[in-house]
């Protein structure tokens, strides 16, 4: 019986590289200078904490973290409990309602239960300055998250990648479609959701692909938070 691979096994060496250390020091300097950086330091790598490498069956790629107060906590599209679901996530709920008539839109936007079921909720850039979208886009995070995608591609099989919008779809070049599945649609943002995200059927298609492989489908329903 082989020991399951951990994130440390597959990306530990990547995190030792000079460019990665440079990202961490750059972000730390920004925080020390009094800038507000999201998510908080302890949450930056939550996507990896909540979804162990051996559990990754689905990847939903985001771009960079939400840049409003108390929103970002290290999972793409997700917000902390008590914070209203942002517009992109509301559109994801609308799509779930279309695909699953029994889906009840939750009173929150906290997606931890998806992550714990094997949905890696990965942003391609892992930090952002308050109120400034894409402010850390050139820090080098994408070198790291590209390496993450490459490792999933190499060492896992049958993973379903949900690539919404042009930014996420660029990452498709790392994915071998002979061993994995890619589902593409426009981004769920209000700017583009009506161009084909709404009606894409991706949540149900994901579960059909999991079931075909004998894997447990995702329960997309989120329990209410009191």
UniProtKB/Swiss-Prot annotation:
Pfam families associated with the record: UDG
Record bears the keyword Cytoplasm: yes
InterPro entries: UDG_fam1, Uracil-DNA_glycosylase-like, Uracil-DNA_glycosylase-like_sf
GO biological process terms, semicolon-separated: base-excision repair, AP site formation via deaminated base removal
Keyword set, alphabetical order: Cytoplasm, DNA damage, DNA repair, Hydrolase
Active site: 64 (proton acceptor)
SMART domains: UDG (SM00986), UreE_C (SM00987)
CDD domains reported for this sequence: UDG-F1-like
Transmembrane spans: none
GO MF, one example: uracil DNA N-glycosylase activity
Reactions this protein catalyses: Hydrolyzes single-stranded DNA or mismatched double-stranded DNA and polynucleotides, releasing free uracil
Enzyme class, first EC level, given as a word: hydrolase
Described purpose of this protein according to its UniProt entry: Excises uracil residues from the DNA which can arise as a result of misincorporation of dUMP residues by DNA polymerase or due to deamination of cytosine.
PANTHER family: URACIL-DNA GLYCOSYLASE
Family: Belongs to the uracil-DNA glycosylase (UDG) superfamily. UNG family.
Protein name in the entry: Uracil-DNA glycosylase
Species of provenance: Proteus mirabilis (strain HI4320)
Lineage: Bacteria, Pseudomonadati, Pseudomonadota, Gammaproteobacteria, Enterobacterales
